[in-house]
Amino acid sequence: MTEGRKPHINVGTIGHVDHGKTTLTAALTTVLARKLSGANKVVKYDEIDKAPEEKARGITISTAHVEYETEGRHYAHVDCPGHADYIKNMITGAAQMDVAILVVSATDGAMPQTREHILLAKQVGVKDIVVWINKCDVVEDEEMLSLVDMEIRELLSQYGYDGDSIDAVRGSAVKALEEDADGPWSDKIMELVGALEKIELPMREKDKPFLMSVEDVFSIPGRGTVVTGRIERGVVRVGDKIDIVGLRELQSTVCTGVEMFHKALEAGEAGDNAGILLRGIKKEDVERGQVLSAPGQMKSYKKFKAEVYVLKKEEGGRHTPFFANYQPQFYVRTTDVTGSISLPAGVEMVMPGDNLSIEVALDKPVAIDKGLRFAVREGGRTVGSGIITEILE
């Protein structure tokens, strides 16, 4: 991280429709702009609500991005207007979340989408959740508020979060927007910001063990074989040992050079598009779709569980449902691998627009890990998107 840059955290609002996610997003920007000027700009409800459409992995999603900062941190905050957009966003990882703010209306308590969003957050690896109990200005009864608080904590525990120790702040986003900066409802927004400030900073990709997906392989006369791709995580230095994993038997080699834009470097790091020179490896020994990794860090597998979203016809997806043993291609990192799908008990068929948990058996072993995202493709077009929730074998 460069000097003077604040540590960065990705936040997202989740929760049932009309419980106040977008209003809270507007209130966060507004209160912070009033209380901590500087880089904070007010973003109004309408600007967030008319979120522009974006494409992520071939799927169109409406997502609003706002940012705000505190003395010590910078936050990128994502809010999706529609329920379907949330599901697509979580599964495609269009906007990664380190922490989710679960918005629950004090008047309704937990609703079906509240549960669905918590489950999905868990499935896609959102580590931390803070709770905002909204619309507390219209609930006079303290006991009612305590019941909602208790119910949400139990629900979070049910889905594998630490419900007892999670911060739950009671407030009113609408009131915070209406009153001046020193009002009691604005203080509640600052209390929520305080809860975000306590969240542990995520480990940066650069600090993890080296991993790079192979995109292309070249033979350079007199120098050997060069593999190109984008370094996904970690750092690779000249002289480092490297495993080549996936599609074939594991091979071990040594990095004898790192190049970027035809310049020789000592090292490449997460985010770089680099060429890696490999010792004693012939061009035909490596192929697109394999990965280079730090020794012993990656294995290849054929079976996994995943959470998938199936595109609707209007999104360019299938026009008809599919059934068990459907065999599309799974686009994993840099390659398509054919696999067959097993459906959960009681599910006969899957309709375009559905999201569900499936099991996949691939034809060939590939280097995969929990939390990896993939596209489901048929004849080169994307028909679904998924995330690996468990490795089986």
Curated annotation (Swiss-Prot):
Keywords: Cytoplasm, Elongation factor, GTP-binding, Hydrolase, Magnesium, Metal-binding, Nucleotide-binding, Protein biosynthesis. Transmembrane segments: none annotated. GTP hydrolase that promotes the GTP-dependent binding of aminoacyl-tRNA to the A-site of ribosomes during protein biosynthesis. The gene is tuf1. GO terms for cellular component: cytosol. Belongs to the TRAFAC class translation factor GTPase superfamily. Classic translation factor GTPase family. EF-Tu/EF-1A subfamily. Residues 15-22 are annotated as: G1. Residues 58-62 are annotated as: G2. Mg(2+) binds at residue 22. It is found in: Cytoplasm. Signal peptide: none annotated. It comes from Anaplasma phagocytophilum (strain HZ). Monomer. The lineage of its organism: Bacteria, Pseudomonadati, Pseudomonadota, Alphaproteobacteria, Rickettsiales. Residues 134-137 are annotated as: G4. It catalyses: GTP + H2O = GDP + phosphate + H(+). InterPro entries: EF-Tu_GTP-bd, EF-Tu_GTPase, EFTu-like_2, EFTU_2, G_TR_CS, P-loop_NTPase, Small_GTP-bd, T_Tr_GTP-bd_dom. It holds the Pfam family GTP_EFTU_D3. Residues 79-82 are annotated as: G3. Its EC number is 3.6.5.3. This is Elongation factor Tu. Residues 172-174 are annotated as: G5. GO terms for molecular function: GTP binding; GTPase activity; guanosine tetraphosphate binding; translation elongation factor activity. GTP binds at residues 15-22, 79-83, 134-137. Residues 6-204 form the tr-type G domain.
